[in-house]
Design a protein with these regions (language model features):
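Bacterial Sec-dependent N-terminal signal peptides
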Residues: 1-22
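Carbohydrate-interacting regions of secretory-pathway proteins
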Residues: 20-204
Length: 204
């Protein structure tokens, strides 16, 4: 009986990542479109703003300080889905998956500062760079100056990414940190404006 249950669990995860994305519900919202509930607002916040349409904007300040908006909670296995739009400047952003050390993956949004080209949906590992380019065979998938959907699953040390409904990444990081917060990045040293909306997070 135990073997049957285990096999069912394994097949469930296999089908999840063969057939695609999860269904998120209202209760899974991590951003309510009105407040910073569920998030740790940086001290003297001048970067993160919410407008009347429920859109979260991250805008560089004049000194290009940069900022990260962290979730209050820490997560083990989880899935996050959001929509983003690159508004202005050289956008270098992303989602920190369980922290920002060399044991953590960041899913890139926009231009890589080191590679000087767009690496959206690709994993970035601090001190190691980009081990794989997610959109190498899907260069027309990313919509410039329009809304894009991004869904990321972190299951143990495995990371799965969908951009605009298409599976583009299946990556594993050896010795990955398996618990930590989620962060939205406004990269320092850049002049940029990026927007987010419809953000959901579900523990797995």
């Amino acid at each position: 009986m135990k073997k049957i249950i285990l096999l069912t669990i394994v097949l469930t995860f296999m089908s999840l990542h063969v057939y695609g994305q999860l269904k998120f519900e209202e209760k899974d919202k991590i951003f309510d479109g009105k407040t910073f509930t569920n998030w740790v607002v940086p001290e003297n916040n001048i970067w993160w703003k919410i407008d009347s349409k429920g859109i979260l904007s991250a805008i560089s300040d004049s000194t290009k300080t940069g900022s990260t908006l962290w979730s209050e909670e820490k997560y083990n296995d989880f899935a996050i889905r959001l929509e983003f739009k690159m508004i202005d400047g050289i956008v270098d952003s992303g989602i920190f998956m369980r922290g920002e050390s060399s044991e953590n993956v960041q899913i890139q949004i926009g231009i890589s500062g080191s590679l000087k080209r767009d690496m959206t949906a690709s994993p970035y590992v601090p001190k190691k760079g980009y081990p794989i380019e997610a959109l190498k065979d899907h260069t027309d998938l990313l919509k410039q100056k329009d809304w894009n959907s991004l869904e990321v699953h972190a299951i143990a040390n495995h990371y799965y990414v969908w951009l605009n409904g298409l599976a583009v990444l299946d990556y594993s990081l050896k010795n990955a940190n398996l618990i930590g917060p989620v962060g939205l990045q406004l990269h320092p040293g850049k002049t940029m404006n990026i927007q987010f909306k419809n953000m959901f997070l579900k523990t797995l």
